[in-house]
């Protein structure tokens, strides 16, 4: 339980929070999804490694707003250093009296790609195999141990403190191409300066490369990119001016997802990229649905 100072509670803005808050009075849970398993994504690791306090402060604010009785921080198995940092910092919160013991529990992930899906994450938190649940009911209605559970991403709670301090108008003042806000892009591939790039929502990949990544590596020509990691699809360089945001890529059969931008050059065979992605999904499919269970294997065998 958080030791809450008396103050007015802002109204949650997300639809999931609204569903969560409408549930009957009683214990409610909150989970932070730190299972950063999408290929090419590393922004959560960067933020937690450089400023874990901001993340934890945002977590406490979010838990206070939705009146959560307990919070699980579910971290990727491949991030043992981050797990150690968070557990040490949570102990400090307890010692200083900011939270009661066991209010925040850092859980080590199961190492499976599918556990990044919120209902599979809930199953894993409960000690079960990480398999997506049938919905409805949604996790905001029936989550951890059957209790209403709100699932947030790491980046969502990471920005809460700054938005509280500077106001929503500050955050919404950023954006391009009729989009609003900031996005954290995990940029990798054949650029001079890869890494986590905080850029306006709606920026195009061409502007992202030139303004934030120093351009392409010398001797490399930009030919294609992954706008949303392994599951987000592949787009040619001829479509490099599309705004990057949550609802701008569907017409091209792609989506931004976790904003993992992988830049591909003319030194790489696109067929090899596609084959590598199919091998990844062949290995990581949870096997629940036939197209995903059998499709990647068929694609790999066709290559």
Where in the sequence are the language-model features?
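Single conserved hydrophobic/aromatic residue that forms the stacking wall/gate
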Residues: 1-16, 20
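Iron-sulfur-cluster electron-transfer modules
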Residues: 14-129
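Ferredoxin-type iron-sulfur electron-transfer modules in oxidoreductases and energy-metabolism complexes
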Residues: 26, 34, 45-46, 70-71, ...
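Hydrophobic alpha-helical positions that pack around
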Residues: 26, 83-201, 213
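Short alpha-helix boundary/capping segments
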Residues: 43-54, 152, 197-200, 281
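Short amphipathic, charge-patterned alpha-helical segments
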Residues: 58-60, 202-217
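Active-site loop ensemble at the mouth of alpha/beta enzyme cores that anchors a bound cofactor
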Residues: 124-136, 238-255
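Short loop-to-beta-strand transition segments
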Residues: 215-229
């Amino acid at each position: 339980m958080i030791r809450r100072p008396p103050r007015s509670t802002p109204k949650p803005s997300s639809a999931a929070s609204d569903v969560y808050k409408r549930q009957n009075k009683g214990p409610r849970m909150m989970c932070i999804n730190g299972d950063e398993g999408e290929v090419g994504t590393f922004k959560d690791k960067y933020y937690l490694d450089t400023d874990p306090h901001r993340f934890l402060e945002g977590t406490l604010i979010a838990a206070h707003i939705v009146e959560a009785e307990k919070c699980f921080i579910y971290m990727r198995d491949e991030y043992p250093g981050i797990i150690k940092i968070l557990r040490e910092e949570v102990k400090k919160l307890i010692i200083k009296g900011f939270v009661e013991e066991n209010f925040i529990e850092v859980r080590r992930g199961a190492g499976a790609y599918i556990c990044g899906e919120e209902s599979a994450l809930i199953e894993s938190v409960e000690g079960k195999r990480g398999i997506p649940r049938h919905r409805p009911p949604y996790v905001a209605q029936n989550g951890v141990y059957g209790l209403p559970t709100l699932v947030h991403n790491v980046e969502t709670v990471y920005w809460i403190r700054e938005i509280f301090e500077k106001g929503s108008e500050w955050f919404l003042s950023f954006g391009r191409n009729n989009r609003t806000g900031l996005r954290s892009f995990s940029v990798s591939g054949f650029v001079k300066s890869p890494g986590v790039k905080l850029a306006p929502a709606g920026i195009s990949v061409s502007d992202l490369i030139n303004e934030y990544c120093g351009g392409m590596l010398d001797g490399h020509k930009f030919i294609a990119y992954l706008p949303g990691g392994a599951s987000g699809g592949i787009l040619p360089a001829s479509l490099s001016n599309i705004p990057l945001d949550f609802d701008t890529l569907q017409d091209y059969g792609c989506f931004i997802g976790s904003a993992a931008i992988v830049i591909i050059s003319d030194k790489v065979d696109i067929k090899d990229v596609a084959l590598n992605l199919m091998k990844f999904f062949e290995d990581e499919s949870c096997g629940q649905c036939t197209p995903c269970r059998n499709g990647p294997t068929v694609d790999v065998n066709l290559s």
